[in-house]
């Protein structure tokens, strides 16, 4: 336990220190998505995380016991997460329409791989790819309580995503492995 704590503490301190220093994901990255959340009324930002390649590289060097996680962290160029609380007076139907429009408006190199729509909520997962790799992943989701944007940038292969979690059912893991990228 203490050994694990000694490994985690330096990484946690780096996260705190570098988040204040502007070590963030670059908007010039091909997998970057600009979330224009300023256009939405009735939102209060709860969480905003932006981690760039320097911190991800440090984190990768400190993952000794999981080669899959280490390889994934080393391949990442940036991770951005924004979570907003939705106020009671916000127009939820309008927010859902905005999120749907934002997902649809991404350029033609972005491919929607998941769309879930239930009542007054919606979620989209999109990937941007080249012929060889996935360059970016974007998640846009809204429900009655929060609006969430996630953007993961880096050159990822479907096999990396397949190996990421043993919780992925076998059929979905096979779909990731054979996902066409061209």
Language-model features: where?
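Bacterial N-terminal signal peptides that target proteins for export
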Residues: 1-10
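C-terminal motif of bacterial Sec signal peptides marking the signal peptidase cleavage site
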Residues: 17-20
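Bacterial signal peptide processing site
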Residues: 22-25
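Early exported N-terminus immediately downstream of N-terminal targeting peptides
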Residues: 29-99
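Extracytoplasmic
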Residues: 44-46, 74-78, 108, 118-122, ...
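Short Gly/Thr-rich strand-loop-strand
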Residues: 103-129, 175-181
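A short, solvent-exposed beta-edge/loop patch
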Residues: 126-161
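C-terminal partner/receptor-binding element of secreted or periplasmic proteins
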Residues: 154-182
């Amino acid at each position: 336990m203490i050994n694990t704590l000694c490994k985690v503490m330096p990484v946690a301190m780096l996260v705190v220190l570098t988040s204040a220093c502007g070590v963030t994901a670059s908007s010039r990255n091909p997998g970057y998505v600009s979330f224009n959340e300023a256009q939405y009324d009735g939102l209060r930002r709860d969480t905003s995380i932006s981690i760039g390649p320097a911190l991800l590289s440090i984190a990768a060097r400190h993952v000794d016991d999981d080669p899959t996680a280490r390889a994934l962290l080393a391949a990442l160029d940036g991770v951005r997460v924004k979570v907003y609380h939705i106020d009671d007076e916000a127009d939820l139907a309008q927010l859902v329409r905005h999120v749907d429009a934002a997902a649809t408006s991404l350029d033609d190199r972005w491919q929607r791989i998941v769309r879930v729509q239930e009542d007054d909520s919606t979620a989209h997962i999109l990937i941007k790819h080249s012929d060889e790799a996935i360059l970016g992943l974007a998640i846009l989701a809204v429900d009655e309580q929060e609006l969430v944007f996630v953007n993961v940038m880096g050159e990822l292969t479907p096999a990396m995503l397949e190996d990421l979690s043993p919780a992925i059912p076998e059929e979905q893991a096979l779909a990731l492995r054979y996902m066409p990228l061209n």
